[in-house]
Curated annotation (Swiss-Prot):
Its EC number is 1.1.1.-, 1.1.1.393. The active site is at Y162. NADP(+) binds at D70, V71, N97, Y162, K166. Transmembrane segments: none annotated. GO terms for molecular function: oxidoreductase activity, acting on the CH-OH group of donors, NAD or NADP as acceptor. This is 3beta-hydroxysteroid dehydrogenase. It is an enzyme of class 1 (oxidoreductase). Gene3D superfamilies: NAD(P)-binding Rossmann-like Domain (3.40.50.720). Involved in the modification of secondary bile acids into iso-bile acids (3beta-bile acids) via epimerization of the 3-OH group through a 3-oxo-intermediate. Catalyzes the reduction of 12-alpha-hydroxy-3-oxo-5-beta-cholan-24-oate (3-oxo-DCA) and 3-oxo-5-beta-cholan-24-oate (3-oxo-LCA) to yield isodeoxycholate (isoDCA) and isolithocholate (isoLCA), respectively. Keywords: Lipid metabolism, NADP, Oxidoreductase, Steroid metabolism. Pfam families: adh_short, adh_short_C2. It comes from Mediterraneibacter gnavus (strain ATCC 29149 / DSM 114966 / JCM 6515 / VPI C7-9). One of its GO terms (biological process) is bile acid metabolic process.
Length: 276
């Protein structure tokens, strides 16, 4: 039943993992999925925010729990999935959402630490999780949705590490789809553009700093900004950012049984940002 935009019962009896679940898009996914019947394992690093997500899921009439994990740490990820296996015995849906934007720098400006911080948070975390997810899903199938970015579909200035990591997530998504299609596992990537989340706010602050640096070099910061990854609401056809709830609706469609025939797709959820 569709109730106020929610599809009640869509995820009944499903065990769903959501990483990066304590804020932004991940939080919206966890709350809506719980409302639609899933038992949600909300994963993040902040216990206080994790408890708040669980409370929000329960307030929405759903159920779930918080499991603390740094998903960029392969041993921590193995321990996380061992706990899920022991407690639930299966995994039906996984939304790999954890990630960062990182330093706004060109290739020559990036230090090694800048690079590896973003690769660990965005790509390695997704790989570590996918590797464990397919093991738990293979007996009965499942759905994996990786949250990539429009930066996984095109390039942007001063975002070398982020663009590389998100293109790699899109590639990993296709590889998983190819390897596990006959085992009943779908794997798709959603590529948001501007979305009103704490991550976007932090990135916007970093971009303001970057614009000041460009101006100090005698260059036009507005020329740089209009091509940047976070160039603002006016750069989408819809002239607005998405809400986390709008992105969650798209993600959960691909996580649902309604999308069983879709796999290996890299889907722009970007208000038309990548059409021009």
């Amino acid at each position: 039943m569709n109730f106020g935009g929610f599809i009640m019962g869509r995820f009944d009896e499903k065990i769903m993992l959501v990483t990066g679940a304590t804020s932004g898009i991940g939080r919206a996914v966890a709350i809506r999925a719980a409302k639609e019947g899933a038992t949600v394992v909300a994963v993040g690093r902040n216990e206080e925010r994790g408890a708040a997500v669980v409370a929000a899921m329960e307030e929405a009439g759903g159920k779930g729990e918080f499991m603390k994990c740094d998903v960029s740490n392969k041993d921590a990820v193995k321990a996380l999935f061992a706990e899920i296996q022991e407690k639930y015995g299966k995994l039906d849906v996984a939304v790999n959402n954890a990630g960062i934007v990182g330093a706004s720098k060109t290739v020559e400006e990036l230090e090694d630490d800048d690079w590896f911080q973003v690769i660990d948070a965005n790509l390695n975390s997704c790989f570590f999780c996918c590797r464990e997810e397919v093991k738990l899903m293979q007996p009965s199938g499942g759905a994996i949705v990786n949250v990539s970015s429009v930066a996984g579909m095109r390039g942007f200035p001063s975002a070398a590490a982020y663009v590389a990591s998100k293109h790699a997530v899109s590639g990993l998504t296709k590889a998983v789809a190819v390897d596990y299609a006959t085992k009943g596992i779908t794997c798709n990537a959603i590529c948001p553009a501007g979305t009103d989340t704490p991550l976007t706010e932090r990135s916007s602050a970093d971009i303001k700093t970057r614009m000041a640096e460009i101006a100090a070099q005698g260059k036009d910061p507005m020329e740089w900004l209009k091509n940047s990854m976070l160039s603002g609401k006016t750069e989408t056809l819809q002239k607005k950012n998405a809400t986390p709830e709008e992105q969650a609706a798209t993600i959960l469609y691909f996580a649902s049984d309604e999308a069983r025939h879709i796999t290996g797709s890299i889907v722009a959820s970007d208000g038309g940002f990548t059409t021009y």
